Amino acid sequence: MEIQVVDNNVEKAIRVLKRKLQQEGLFREMKQRKFYEKPSVKRKRKEKEAQRRLRKKMRMMKKA
């Protein structure tokens, strides 16, 4: 990943970098990889996330 610094504005470049990392889910992945997650726990978490996405999608479809 590459961020360009314009006019020596490093603070803005850092904000842009943080936003891109957040959008790609890198912070969440680092947090999850900090400790070992058993396969059964990982599977349950993924199922829960899928259900959450499905509910969100259904809400969005209901509004439209």
UniProtKB/Swiss-Prot annotation:
Q: A GO term (biological process) for this protein?
A: translation
Q: Which residues form the signal peptide?
A: none
- Which superkingdom heads the taxonomic lineage of this protein's source? Bacteria
Keywords (alphabetical) are: Ribonucleoprotein, Ribosomal protein
* InterPro entries found in the cross-reference section: Ribosomal_bS21, Ribosomal_bS21_sf
Where in the sequence does UniProt note compositional bias of the Basic residues kind?
53-64
Q: Name one GO molecular function term.
A: structural constituent of ribosome
Sorted alphabetically, the Gene Ontology cellular component annotations on this record are:
ribonucleoprotein complex; ribosome
UniProt region (Disordered), positions on chain: 37-64
Pfam families reported in the protein's UniProt record? Ribosomal_S21
Family, as annotated: Belongs to the bacterial ribosomal protein bS21 family.
The cross-references to PANTHER family, in alphabetical order and at most eight, read: MITOCHONDRIAL 28S RIBOSOMAL PROTEIN S21, SMALL RIBOSOMAL SUBUNIT PROTEIN BS21M
HAMAP family tied to this protein: Ribosomal_bS21 (MF_00358)
Protein name (record) = Small ribosomal subunit protein bS21
Q: Which organism is it from?
A: Syntrophotalea carbinolica (strain DSM 2380 / NBRC 103641 / GraBd1) (Pelobacter carbinolicus)
Which taxonomic lineage is given here? Answer: Bacteria, Pseudomonadati, Thermodesulfobacteriota, Desulfuromonadia, Desulfuromonadales
